[in-house]
Structures are given as structure tokens and as C-alpha cells.
Amino acid sequence: MVPQTETKAGAGFKAGVKDYRLTYYTPDYMVKDTDILAAFRMTPQPGVPPEECGAAVAAESSTGTWTTVWTDGLTSLDRYKGRCYDIEPVAGEDNQYIAYVAYPIDLFEEGSVTNLFTSIVGNVFGFKALRALRLEDLRIPPAYAKTFQGPPHGIQVERDKINKYGRGLLGCTIKPKLGLSAKNYGRAVYECLRGGLDFTKDDENVNSQPFMRWRDRFTFVAEAIYKSQAETGEIKGHYLNVTAATSEEMMKRAECAKDLGVPIIMHDYLTAGLTANTSLAHYCRDTGLLLHIHRAMHAVIDRQRNHGIHFRVLAKALRLSGGDHLHSGTVVGKLEGEREVTLGFVDLMRDDYIEKDRSRGIYFTQDWCSLPGVMPVASGGIHVWHMPALVEIFGDDACLQFGGGTLGHPWGNAPGAAANRVALEACTQARNAGVDLARKGGDVIRAACKWSPELAAACEVWKEIKFEFETIDKL
């Protein structure tokens, strides 16, 4: 008898989903300490049960395919398959569910974030049974975390290298981000560092354009660093962006920065790729360079609430791949960032052991097994009036970057840097004395203005500047 073949467009799709549930939905499964765990926010297509979708996610991101194949009998699928072991509805949302999937550790190459992401956030995100899918969190087990080098140096080693303790670090992105000549760029770097900043920074899209080739920029910036260090007696740095069209060119630029003796370089880890970033992090560990990481392109991936990858996952990926700094949002500036959610992934970047806390978006307890921490970078639309909130939110182990908030000072770059340095030290001193910066931060800034005309001028310029938009990224 010849079997009947269904030719309707949806028939094969339905059959495939039903097959997944039989094998990959296992609510009785006991999670192992070595499993990599994922929390997915699923929006099923109309009429598709969440159990079928959860099973499809587990299957398509591990061993499954759309039909039964004879080679299944040549291996142990029970050993290697992903398993959807729990599904819960999302409160306040229609037809959205959190699916928890456990993956055996043997599915992934040791020390490879690229391989991890290729499986977990690969083809499954285009699966027809799902209207939308978002990876909310990952649990990296100690057995897998220990296969990674992680950040080249970490927070404490960075402080030892630059000899700065007891306060947050201050930075500034040079503006305009594009169009300056190398010499004028170096001049702006020098003025900001001399004025009191710890770091200045290339913008993420500064690479090697016709108006400013990378080697010229590196040379003038190195001169600015050495001159400002000689005049202030402090160790200074500039995040030289080594991101390039090829990995070979990237490493060439990193080596030039090392030869010039600068302390830190920069990389755009999402646009350049995780493999390139891991190679660069290993190089920085070997040569003593600090590595600043920019997250350009992240909002394309993480901003929508129901589809993509949450930034806490991208932050975990960076901690595995390697970076000493990572931009993390500000809560109070011009860029997206809700307070509790931001603090949740900031803790995942800095701390060694983080407890599960759904109120902050942390779905799993994470043990980093002494992997070095990543310093969060707050940047984007911040100025001196934001300083109390930034100190209260981020504490000391953070880099606060004021681009326009430094270079937009009416008296120039160096006074802008001085205003930020005075504001930071005033807020830090007040906090250490027991002042509640959330309630009395404005009074602290106003009091400091009496002793700093640069700060007073900055406060006058930016007293009315606010970015009061409702955040999209909510729990």
C-alpha cells in the first residue's frame, strides 16, 4: 500500500511539532549540575500549544530535525538532546511563556562562545511554530565556565595597573565622533586627561577612515597620554579602537598599541564577532593590555521584549569571551536601561556568585568560579547632575563616561573634565560620610559648586537637560 502524502502547506509543520513533543518535552527531568540552562520567552503561533513550542526550541537548538532519520540509531539521543523541562506563563502577557531548556555540556566545544551561541541562538529563532522567541538568560555551569580564560585582567588587576582606588573611574568619548584630524583628536585627548579624567575613548565607529588613519591617531593619542601623565602625576589611558576589517589587521593594530606603551585598547565585540574578540582577549592577557569592550549593535538584538537576546546574556557571553570593560547602560541617561534589570546584569558582570532573583531578571543562580569580573561602563547622555545617581547606582567599580558632558562645557574640554572630577569626588566623599545621594545628591553638587567654578558653569548649562522616556526593557 502506498502511503498518502499530505500536500497542504501546514501539514508537515504540524507533524514536525508533534514529533518534537514526544521526545524533547520532559517535565520530569532532573537538572544536572553540568547542564547549560536557558530561559526562553516564547510566543507560539495561534493554535500551537506551548509544550509543542518548548519541545521544538529544545530540539532545534540541539539534536532535532524535522523528521526521523535512520542515523538517530547510531548515537544516544537521550544523552545529547536538549530537554524542555518546565514551562510557565508570563504574567500580564497573553500567549507568552517562559520555556526552560537544559542542554548537556557535551554539546558544546570547550572555551568557545561562538559554538555555544551557534546552537542555542541559531536556526531555532526562525522556526515557524514560533511567532517570536527571546533568550532571557543562560546558566553557565562551573564545569563549562572553567574552560574559558574570561576577561584579560579583571577589576582588581586594572586598579593595580592604573593605581586608582576608592572611587569610580572617569572617561570621555571624544566628539565629534567622526571628522577630526589625528592631531586635533590628540589635542582633545590631552585636554580631557589633563583636566582630570582617567580615560578618554575612541567612538565605536572610529576605525581607520580617510580623515584620520589609525596609525596617525595612535601616535598623537600616545603623545597626549604621556604629556598629561607627566603634568598630572596620574596614570592615564585612551581606549584605542583596534576593530578592523580582518582579524589579522585587528591584531596588527593591537600590537602597535602595545609597542607605543598605552595601557588599554578597545574592541566592538558584536560587530567584529565573538571569535575575534576571544583572540584579542587572549592577546591582551599575554601582553598586559587592558581591553575595553563596546556593545555597538546590541539594541538590534536585545531591545524588543519578545524577540532576540536579552543583554544579560550578551554580557555573560562577553565575560566568557573576554573584556575588562563593557558598556552597560546608565539608567539615567539617553539610552535604554531600567534600574533593577540593569543592576541585575551589572552584578552578573562584576560579582563571582549571583543568586537567582526574578525581580531583577536573573533566572538562574550563576557561579563564575573566580573568573575575573568586568567593569561596567555607564555612558550616553549623562552630565554632572547625574553624578549622584550614578555613584549611588553603580558604586565604585564602574567607569562613568561623559562625552558631551565633558566636551560640551562652555569653557572648554579641560574645565569640563575638571567639573566631572570634582562632582565625582564630592559624591563619593558624601556617600562615604553617610549621605543619601538618592535624596540629597543635588545638595551635594550645589555645595561643591562653591569651590569649583568649572562645576558651577557645567551645572548651569545642563540644569534643564533630561531624557524622560519610558523604558522598553521591563520584566
From Swiss-Prot:
Source species, domain of life: Eukaryota
Other remarks on this protein: The basic functional RuBisCO is composed of a large chain homodimer in a 'head-to-tail' conformation. In form I RuBisCO this homodimer is arranged in a barrel-like tetramer with the small subunits forming a tetrameric 'cap' on each end of the 'barrel'.
Residues of the active site: 175 (proton acceptor), 294 (proton acceptor)
Names of the cofactor(s): Mg(2+)
Reaction equations catalysed: 2 (2R)-3-phosphoglycerate + 2 H(+) = D-ribulose 1,5-bisphosphate + CO2 + H2O; D-ribulose 1,5-bisphosphate + O2 = 2-phosphoglycolate + (2R)-3-phosphoglycerate + 2 H(+)
Described purpose of this protein according to its UniProt entry: RuBisCO catalyzes two reactions: the carboxylation of D-ribulose 1,5-bisphosphate, the primary event in carbon dioxide fixation, as well as the oxidative fragmentation of the pentose substrate in the photorespiration process. Both reactions occur simultaneously and in competition at the same active site.
Subcellular location, record wording: Plastid, Chloroplast
GO cellular component: chloroplast
Residue numbers binding Mg(2+): 201, 203-204
N6-carboxylysine: residues carrying this PTM: 201
GO biological process: photorespiration; reductive pentose-phosphate cycle
Residues holding substrate: 123, 173, 177, 295, 327, 379
Subunit structure: Heterohexadecamer of 8 large chains and 8 small chains.
Name of this protein: Ribulose bisphosphate carboxylase large chain
EC number(s) recorded for this UniProt protein: 4.1.1.39
Propeptide residue span(s): 1-2
Modification sites for N-acetylproline: 3
Location, primary (coarse class): plastid
Database matches in Gene3D superfamilies: Ribulose bisphosphate carboxylase, large subunit, C-terminal domain (3.20.20.110), RuBisCO large subunit, N-terminal domain (3.30.70.150)
Keyword Lyase assigned: yes
Gene that encodes it: rbcL
GO MF assignments: magnesium ion binding; monooxygenase activity; ribulose-bisphosphate carboxylase activity
Native source species: Stigeoclonium helveticum (Green alga)
Site residues, Transition state stabilizer: 334
UniProt-listed Pfam families: RuBisCO_large (PF00016), RuBisCO_large_N (PF02788)
Family: Belongs to the RuBisCO large chain family. Type I subfamily.
